[in-house]
């Protein structure tokens, strides 16, 4: 639901105790390990990493007499989606993704050094044990990810959402588990018999096979569920207003009316969403253009069709 949150935790084991080296020594030691438990939050920032480091410092610790571990157990180890082009500059699909790479531990080590926390150990990967204490928990509302995912057509955000869906079927989250949820929804939407293939969450995969019929079925399914529709409608780009269609349909009846998501690959251009017809009826639509040498031609056609439906 819309109250879902992405969760990233900083945990630790062992105890904090003073150094016994010198009587006057004020050094506080963590006699244990630190764990960063990933939730595939794609919005983690440099400031968030600094907060993680400060949460360890706030324990009174200036030396970690143990190791720092990355807990990536939230999802499988697949770094890329099935059928992605090898020469694309794709983000790494890690439970601890940071700035599109799997380098959160390195960033944390730098932040700890800035907080004058010394690591007397090494870094690695290990699942956080039950009973570990939580130093800090970062919870990010789903809509904070949904909005830029839809408005800006962010592929990493879409993949992170996909794995959250897969997580509802148990750990570790996988693309196949997310696809099982998609298949179940497709049946409920009345399009289960339509020819299709789901491969990833962003649409980058060359193995995806969808039709306009299926997209409209999903849109109608969402429309009938008020909470889902409200969140989706708020997140969709608005013609001539914002997002990926900010510069499209200006000066037409579609401006400010069409709420729709773009889809773009080499030779493919699509647009799907909602608009309100002159009689007040809300329409769900999907337009797919394939085999186009220049995307602008497809977009111009889509814009004209949307304007016609709004008149």
Feature names for model-found ranges:
Residues 36-38, 144, 148, 159-163, ...:
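Short, well-ordered beta-strand elements
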């Amino acid at each position: 639901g819309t109250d879902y949150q992405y969760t990233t935790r900083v945990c630790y084991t062992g105890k904090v105790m003073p150094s016994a080296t010198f009587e006057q020594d004020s050094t506080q030691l963590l006699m244990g390990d630190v764990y960063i438990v990933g939730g595939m939050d794609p919005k983690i920032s440099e400031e968030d990493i600094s907060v993680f480091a400060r949460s360890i410092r706030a324990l009174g610790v200036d030396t970690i007499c143990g190791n720092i571990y990355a807990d990536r157990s939230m999802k499988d180890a697949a770094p890329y989606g099935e059928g992605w082009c090898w020469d694309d500059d794709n983000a790494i699909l890690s439970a601890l993704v940071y700035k599109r790479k799997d380098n959160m531990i390195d960033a944390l080590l730098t932040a700890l050094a800035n907080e004058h926390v010394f690591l007397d150990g090494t870094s690695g990967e290990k699942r956080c044990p039950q009973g570990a204490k939580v130093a800090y928990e970062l919870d990010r509302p789903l809509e904070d990810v949904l909005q830029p995912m839809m408005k800006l057509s962010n592929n990493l955000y879409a993949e992170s959402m996909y794995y959250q869906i897969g997580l509802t079927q148990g750990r570790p989250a996988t693309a196949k588990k997310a696809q099982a949820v998609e298949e179940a929804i497709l049946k409920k939407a009345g399009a289960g018999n339509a020819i299709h293939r789901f491969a990833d969450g962003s649409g980058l995969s060359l193995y995806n096979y969808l039709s306009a019929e299926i997209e409209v079925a999903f849109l109608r399914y969402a429309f009938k569920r008020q909470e889902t529709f409200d969140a989706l409608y708020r997140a969709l780009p608005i013609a001539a207003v914002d997002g990926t269609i900010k510069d499209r349909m200006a000066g037409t009846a579609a401006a400010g009316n069409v709420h729709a998501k773009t889809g773009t690959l080499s030779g493919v251009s699509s647009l799907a969403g909602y608009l309100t017809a002159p009689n007040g009826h809300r329409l769900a639509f999907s337009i797919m253009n394939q085999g186009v040498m220049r995307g602008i031609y497809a977009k111009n056609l889509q814009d004209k069709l949307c304007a016609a439906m709004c008149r």
